[in-house]
Amino acid sequence: MIANCLNDKPLPVYGKGENVRDWLYVEDHCKAIDLIIRKGRVGEVYNIGGHNEMKNIDIVKLICKALDKPESLITYVTDRKGHDMRYAIDPTKIHNELGWLPETKFADGIQKTIRWYLDNRDWWEEIISGEYQNYYERMYAGR
């Protein structure tokens, strides 16, 4: 989304964008995985969640606003059949057993993520110019 927004490309949003996801900053996710590897019980499953559920459309609009881009870039595409409206993550176990909680507030994490895209444009533009672009076009063509 951020790359498309920076390049003034369509921002595909499934259905009306009402799908809810639990958002977590990548460094918090990595720290949780590291903690599980070091202190988790072998064979156990630990859900990693941010306690931060938001609608997809709200995230996309937030990105547009942060980058001073028009919401007219948002393109509503046909939702996948059977697409879940909400992905709920219950991270109670990792908190209770390992003491993990996310450290980064959503507002800070999204700003850091956007800043990363701005500071590393050469890197990610090379990636999306190749095979990924072909995949992206196959996935969203005609939707």
Predicted regions and their residues:
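C-terminal substrate-binding subdomain of Rossmann-fold SDR/epimerase-dehydratase oxidoreductases
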Residues: 2-143
